[in-house]
Amino acid sequence: MRKIVFKMERPGLVEEGQTVEVSESVTPVNVNYMIEPAVAMSGLFKFNERLKSRQGVVKEIIQNDRGYYVTVEFDE
């Protein structure tokens, strides 16, 4: 299992236990992922760290002074 943390700007867009689809954005240097439809965005990853799966399960949603952070677990 692989976990990735996504930044979400407002609450209630996803729930713990929900299955989500992610899309990949490729730049010349790295890749990042977005929970669709434009719910939350991941940090940057190197090409050799790319996801093999495009579907995951929301495991945790944390709120702090910087916003909402969604942890998604992928089956890889």
Where are each of the predicted segments found?
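Short alpha-helix capping/helix-loop boundary micro-motifs
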Residues: K3-R10
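Short, compact, well-ordered microdomains
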Residues: R50-E76
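Short aromatic-glycine motifs in intrinsically disordered, low-complexity regions
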Residues: A38-R50
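Short, Lys/Arg- and Gly-enriched loop/turn segments at beta-strand edges
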Residues: T27-V39
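Loop/turn positions that initiate beta-strands
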Residues: E16-V20
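Absolute protein N-terminus
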Residues: M1-R2, E76
